[in-house]
Amino acid sequence: MSDKRRYFGTDGVRGKVGQYPITPDFVLKLGWAAGRVLAKQGTKKVIIGKDTRISGYMLESALEAGLAAAGLKATFTGPMPTPAVAYLTQTFRAEAGIVISASHNPYYDNGIKFFSSEGTKLPDDIELAIEAELDKEIECVESAELGKATRLNDAAGRYIEFCKSTFPSELSLAKLKIVVDCANGATYHIAPNVFTELGADVIAMGVTPNGTNINHEVGATDVRALQQRVVEEQADLGLAFDGDGDRIIMVDHLGNKVDGDQIAYIIARDALRRGELKGGVVGTLMTNLGMENGLKQLGIPFVRAAVGDRYVMEKLLEKGWKIGAENSGHVILLDKVTTGDAIVAALQVLASVVGSELSLNELSKGMTLYPQVLENVRFAGQGNPLEAEAVKKTVEDVEADLGSKGRVLLRKSGTEPLIRVMVEGEDGELVQNSALKIAQAVKDNC
């Protein structure tokens, strides 16, 4: 079996709807191939959730047909956050969980990602085995062995109760006014209820999905509307989720953005204070130097993984640690969940706010973020602009200018046709100009 991936990226199979591989015929075959690999003795049951994209209806039907042809039973949850599907996969003792989502991407993209029976992302060897099955012709099981579909009507209620169980029972959110932005995505009918039931005064936004407005000027990838609303409502803080509920960005009462690095720092520091920190914190190559330095001052170990929550997870398991995060808002808390869970992560920060009687603004001041600029350069051509001599020379010049007080990172996105340029350092103006200079060099060589 080849170890070269053709379809699976860092977060499953993803692309533009109607363009290969996100087409009904390919997704049907993907369902069949996955069913062939995942089928074992036992229930042969798969949980299928989706976000609020209009294409989700088409793709879940195609998936179910493929799974049924392989003899697996599909249980639909309807719109459901990615971590909820991971949780339900475990509690239902299903063979696997499948999420139809493109996370933070625009509505016209979609994707398919899988969870194992333990609620974790599939190992590489299983994904490669599924790709190998895709080369074969579809063969249906015998008619009597065909799978059938059912619907789980109380999926949202089950997950709401789970989320609430991760919040300390002796605490309440009764004194907090919170603006909750659900990105018109999968948390729209869940997150507001979680925080309301724990006592908060909740102002909900981004809770009217229409199939095409997911992540559009709302949610974790664009917090401007949330920042404005928090200030207007004189709220204590704001929470922004992405389209599938695995990313969380927060906003303090002054309208300042609090990103995944700061969220992980607050959670780790609170765990240290309680004597419950198990090991250190895993970040990524994109993690701000300010977080690394802040943790170091507390005596908390820190290591970097490759960019992508699956690599953060791998490093956590390797080290035996419990807290990992990306600055984009993926926060993994392995003492509570099996994957990145935005609602659960938010609840841990809120527990720190309530327990310490400090504001989110005060808690986030424990670390100082370095100015960091990220430029995305669209890249759909052949070759690798990162290997171009002109690009290498520009990077060398910038690194010389930054010296030991900054760093540069160039990488290809694992989910979109983009080259990501990140520059970080103490001098904000130098960082901005350096990022633009490198981005232009990349554009010139695409």
From Swiss-Prot:
Pfam families: PGM_PMM_I, PGM_PMM_II, PGM_PMM_III, PGM_PMM_IV
EC number(s) on file: 5.4.2.10
Comment on bound cofactor: Binds 1 Mg(2+) ion per subunit.
Gene3D superfamilies in alphabetical order: Alpha-D-Glucose-1,6-Bisphosphate, subunit A, domain 3 (3.40.120.10), Alpha-D-phosphohexomutase, C-terminal domain (3.30.310.50)
Active-site residues annotated for this sequence: S103
Gene Ontology cellular component annotations, sorted alphabetically: cytosol
GO process annotations (BP): carbohydrate metabolic process; peptidoglycan biosynthetic process; UDP-N-acetylglucosamine biosynthetic process
Role, per record: Catalyzes the conversion of glucosamine-6-phosphate to glucosamine-1-phosphate.
Protein family according to the UniProt entry: Belongs to the phosphohexose mutase family.
Name of the protein described by the UniProt record: Phosphoglucosamine mutase
Gene name of the record: glmM
